Every structure is written in C-alpha cells, then in structure tokens.
Regions:
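S-adenosylmethionine
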Residues: 1-440
C-alpha cells in the first residue's frame, strides 16, 4: 500500500518546479498558489517555509546532495532535484520535523522510478550528514562563503570587495534570516500605543522601534486579513523604507513628487507624515500597478495622492520647479532584499550593468522638478556602490546647484548626506538613501 502524499509538501514541490521552469518570483508564485489552496493555516506555513528555505539554501543543499550521491545534482530531473532539496532542507534546518517523517514524506512525492534513489540519498544524510566537510575557509575562501551562506561565488567576491571579508560575512549571514515584519502605524487613524495594545490583546508580540516612533516590529506573522491592517490603521513597511520617508521630511501642505511610486508604501508614509494635507504626485512606469496605490490610499483614508502613468526619465515641463520635495526610489538590482526575495541571489551580476545609467537618467530628469531650497532624495534597495554612492557622485559632478545634507534618526547617521543600511546592523533590508538639497 502506497503512502499518501502530504498536500503541503506536494504544493511546495509544485511551486518550486514552477519557479524553476517559468522563472517566476518566489513570493508571487507562493501567494498565487496559497490563495487558491484550501490548506490549513499550519500547512500553508509549512509550504511557505519549504519554498523560501529551499530557494534560499539551494547552493548549500546541492553541495550536500552531491556529497551524498554519485549522481551530480545538475544531471538529475528537475523534480528529483527539488525533492532532494526539500528533504535535505527539512533534515538540516527544521528540527521540529522528525527525520523519519522528512524522509518518508519526501519519498512519497517522488516519481516511482526515482523513489529508491531519493530514499537512499536522504537516509545517507541521516547516517553521515553531520560529517560532511565544507570547503576550507583558509585555502578556498570564496567557495567556503558560497556553500556556507548559499550565495554564488561571484556575489561572495563582490560583497567581500565592497565590505572587506569579515564584514561581508556578517552581511551574508544576515541575508539568511528574514527580518521581522515592521508595521507603519497610520497616525491618521491610530496612535502607535493604541496599535501596539490592540495587537498584543490579539496575541501578537510587537515591539516599538528605537529608531522611529511610528514603527512597530512584529516577530510574529500578522495576517493581512487582521482587522488593524484591513481597516488601514497600519500597513507593512520595512524600517529602511520608513527611514527613507523620514529623510524626505515632507510637511503638511507640501507638494511632493514620488517619481517611482509603486507599490506605494513610501507614498502612503509620506502622506501620513503630511497629515493628509498638501499634494503628492505619484508616478510609475507600469499602469497596471497604479491601482495598488489607489486602493491602498482608500484603505488608509488618504486623499491627497494623484496617480499617473509616467516614465520618470521623460521630462514634463509643467512640473518644473513645482515640488518642495522629490523622491526618486529608483528601479535597482535588489541585492539588498535577498532575505525577502531569495531568488535574487542567483541573478547574473552582469544583468544589472545597465541600471546605473537608467537610475542616473531618472535623477537628472526629476531634479528639475525641485524648487529652490527643496529636497531631492535618491534611494535604492541594493548595497552596490555603482548604483548608490557612485551614482550620486556622478549626479553632483554635473549639478552644482545641489548639495548633500547629513541626517540622523535614532542614532543612525549619514555620512556626506548618504547612508547605506545593511541587515546585520539594524535588522532592516539592505538599503541606500541620499539626501540632496537644492541651493536657494
């Protein structure tokens, strides 16, 4: 009699196969599958853990599988590869799942012809997995970092070049742990104290941020269907993104341009900071995404946002020098959010080569919308200097009318008007912010 397949693990396998074959983002594939699923909440949580965990730890898991089998992972069928990864991930990282269950449940999902092989590899890990040696840190440091932190060798080398090897390892280690969810309290509807109290009464752990009073860190998962989020009393926004909004510093009555606004969290935070007084022009290249801002603003009780489809590189003379503040949160390589989007780590680094010029073009165009004495903020969710400090330097070299201005928030201080946040320092996304002021 064949063992019944575990539906949670079966769905996780389907999602992993789909992301491999279609190149779909993990979070999008997962969200789509879970919305259609009738699984229980604990089973959905297991699916999420397996999909994110296997994606994040792929290099480490493949290294282990190759050490346990005479057949290299790259030569195996895609489904079998993902089954071995799922099984090994449970054995290596999920202590709460007994080893026998991890093995048997994984084997039950395998094609009949591959069950013996999958069973043999996983059982071999239970016998000698702890004895497998990783590459030597001294003689093969790049390979050691790659296998230990499941990052491609070229990315390890780049991070070591940027930060130095010791600091880079701290950053890599932090990218292996998803940061706690951070909420931005909508002070148009609730106070931080009220929000914290209500969430605690519902059984969620929340902690006030020591950086921003409107930020609440939530170690527990808070479902999007919770009353506080549904009623717009708060929304999810990483602390780095909230810091960016504070650096922009919009005041009630200001005219603000958010040049690359979708999905809208910085737009919303800015409107709340303005007490819903003034005007925000929220633009994005993708018309299909603008509805996210409109629906989010309605839920939050914000009515000062005007959304339009616009390429931020294309000049609009009607906007010239109308804005007190302009935010250019530009498209970037995303190498600061590996903990949330683990598949980004496997991107070819050369794919981002064209981005700095695109980002600079946005900055050079949108700077013309800033009034004399106004503020221009440039931000990315990457930690690569060519998209960050180097781009700001290129901009300033041809725009002497702008000057960097230092800022400080909760003990976090900029240098030369620029700040790079890394997950090992403050538990945020990797993020870059530059504050530039137009001379009056």
């Amino acid at each position: 009699m064949e063992q019944m397949q575990n539906p949670a693990r079966a769905l996780a396998l389907q999602i992993l196969n789909r992301t491999d074959s279609a190149g779909q983002y993990t979070n999008l594939a997962l969200d789509s599958a879970l919305k259609k699923s009738s699984l229980s909440a604990p089973d959905k949580a297991l699916v999420t853990i397996l999909v994110y965990g296997v994606t994040e730890r792929r290099i480490t898991l493949d290294y282990l599988a190759d050490a346990l089998s005479s057949r290299p992972m790259e030569a195996l069928d895609g489904t079998v590869r993902n089954l071995l990864r799922m099984g090994l991930y449970q054995l290596c990282y999920l202590d709460r799942i007994p080893a026998h269950a991890a093995v048997s449940e994984t084997v039950s999902l395998a094609p009949r012809r591959a069950r013996g092989f999958v069973n043999a590899v996983l059982r071999e890990y239970t016998r000698r997995g702890q004895d497998i040696s990783f590459p030597d840190k001294t003689t093969d440091p790049d390979r050691y970092l790659s296998v230990t932190y499941s990052l491609p060798v070229p990315l390890c080398r780049k991070l070591a070049f940027i930060f130095g090897r010791e600091r880079a390892e701290s950053v890599m280690e932090a990218f292996g742990h998803a940061p706690p969810v951070t909420l931005r309290v909508n002070t148009l509807k609730a106070s931080p104290e009220q929000m914290a109290s209500e969430l605690c009464e519902l059984g969620y752990r929340v902690q006030a941020s020591d950086v921003l009073p409107t930020a609440l860190r939530a170690p527990d998962f808070i479902p999007s269907g919770s009353p506080q989020l549904q009623e717009g009393q708060a929304f999810v926004q990483d602390l780095a993104s909230q810091i960016c909004v504070e650096v922009l510093g919009a005041q009630p009555g200001d005219c603000v341009i958010d040049a690359c606004a979708c999905p809208g969290s910085k737009t919303f935070g800015t409107a709340i900071r303005m007490q819903n007084k003034g005007k925000i022009l929220a633009y994005d290249l993708h018309k299909s995404k603008l509805s996210l801002i409109e629906s989010g603003a309605a839920r939050l009780g914000i009515d000062i946002i005007e959304v339009r489809e616009r390429d931020a590189r294309s000049h609009d003379p009607e906007l010239r020098e109308i804005a007190d503040r302009v935010l250019c949160d530009v498209p970037c390589s995303g190498f600061g959010v590996l903990a949330k989007k683990p598949e980004i780590r496997y991107k070819d680094l050369s794919d981002a080569a064209a981005l700095p010029d695109i980002q600079l073009a946005i900055l050079q165009n949108c700077c013309r919308y800033v009034k004399d004495g106004g503020v221009l903020v440039y931000s990315t969710c990457t930690i690569f200097p060519e998209e960050n400090e180097q781009n700001v330097a290129r901009f300033l070299a041809s725009h002497p009318e702008f000057a960097p201005e230092d800022f400080s928030l909760g003990g976090i201080c900029s240098t030369g008007g620029m700040l790079t946040l890394t997950p090992d320092d403050h538990g945020t996304d990797g993020f870059f912010i530059a504050k530039l002021v137009k001379r009056a």
